[in-house]
């Protein structure tokens, strides 16, 4: 894996030199109309995911809009490193493009925890409307910029939902359930607020953990639940819709600033098209995943309005914790007209 990564990065660096030299005069520009090496885009996600669809569409659009003079190669499955390594390599300019879930970015950019405000939105369209709000997006671009990245946009995989063997009909049904979560203090605080027992665990251990009863439940987007067949070990999917599963597309600030204005515009336009396409694909895939789960006999439970209100009330300490660590202006811009929901 290390040798593979080294070859890819060496190729990228060699190509970057050639590409830069091709900007010197007309003769060399004509000779270097097409990059010798494609720019790498790294992702830790598997291939059959919305993350990969987002990345591939972006690369395709960059090539199309540039008339084939700008090329990007997508490397999924952590070929270029895990989430942390990808962020570090992107900041240093070694891997110019990264597509990933926002959760791992909180360590590098604490303000990204604004997306960990639980149980705020009722539909994914509401989330998208708020995420795309120009004022909020401008603030987030500043957050990423201060950390050494250029934020090109957010796609998503819908909401995160819970799978369990317990028929959840009231708040008390969450009590005592050992639920696997990511090692994120805000995510864990949410489940503790509901009375559950959050248990961080490596994702590769989740299926066998459910099978052996080490954990009672887990939470993920529908796509992850189906692609990893987690529903096979669970009787119910509970549509807690507690958090949107956002996917960011970022580029190294150092790399981006080295491009011409025309190239930057091509990248921004390609990112916008890819974002909309990925969202459409996500909606279609979620509908298909729900059908797969229902046909398996696993029951899907939707929470009523009363339960959503109770959950928001229980989550007040979580909101307060996030508000202490995230810019107040950023929280206000993200929540917008939904701020009253959590007060």
Role assignments for model-derived ranges:
Residues 1-4, 160-161:
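N-terminal lobe/hinge region of extracytoplasmic solute-binding protein
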Residues 3-26:
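Sec-dependent N-terminal signal peptides of Gram-positive bacterial secreted proteins and lipoproteins
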Residues 23-126, 135, 144-343:
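N-terminal secretory/targeting leader peptides
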Residues 129:
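Short beta-strand-centered segments that line the small-molecule binding cleft or hinge
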Residues 141:
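Short, flexible, basic/aromatic active-site loop/helix in glycosyltransferases
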């Amino acid at each position: 894996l290390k040798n593979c990564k080294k070859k890819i990065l060496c190729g990228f660096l060699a190509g970057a030199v050639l590409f830069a030299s091709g900007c010197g005069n007309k003769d060399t520009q004509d000779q270097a109309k097409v990059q010798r090496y494609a720019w790498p885009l790294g992702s830790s996600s598997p291939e059959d995911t919305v993350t990969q669809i987002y990345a591939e569409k972006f690369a395709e659009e960059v090539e199309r809009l540039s008339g084939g003079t700008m090329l990007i190669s997508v490397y999924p499955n952590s070929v270029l490193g895990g989430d942390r390594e990808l962020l570090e390599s992107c900041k240093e300019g070694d891997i110019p493009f990264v597509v990933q879930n926002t959760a791992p970015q909180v360590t590098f950019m604490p303000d990204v925890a604004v997306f960990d405000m639980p149980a705020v939105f009722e539909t994914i369209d509401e989330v998208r409307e708020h995420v795309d709000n120009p004022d909020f997006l401008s603030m987030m671009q500043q957050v990423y910029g201060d950390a050494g990245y250029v934020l090109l946009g957010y796609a998503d995989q819908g909401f995160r939902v819970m799978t369990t063997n317990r028929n959840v009909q009231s708040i008390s049904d969450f009590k005592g359930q050992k639920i696997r979560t990511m090692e994120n203090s805000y995510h864990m605080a949410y489940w503790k607020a509901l009375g559950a027992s959050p248990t961080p665990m490596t994702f590769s251990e989740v299926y066998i953990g459910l099978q052996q009863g080490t954990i009672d439940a887990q939470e993920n987007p529908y796509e992850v639940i189906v692609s990893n067949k987690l529903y096979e070990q669970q009787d119910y999917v509970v549509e807690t819709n507690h958090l949107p599963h956002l996917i960011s597309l970022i580029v190294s600030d150092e790399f981006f600033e080295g491009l011409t204005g025309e190239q930057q515009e091509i990248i921004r336009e390609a990112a916008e098209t890819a974002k909309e396409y990925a969202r459409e694909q996500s909606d279609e895939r979620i509908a298909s995943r729900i059908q797969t789960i229902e046909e398996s006999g696993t029951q899907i439970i939707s929470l009523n309005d009363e339960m959503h209100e109770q959950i928001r009330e229980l989550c007040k300490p979580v909101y307060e914790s996030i508000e202490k660590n995230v810019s107040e202006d950023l929280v206000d811009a993200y929540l917008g007209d939904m701020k009253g929901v959590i007060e």
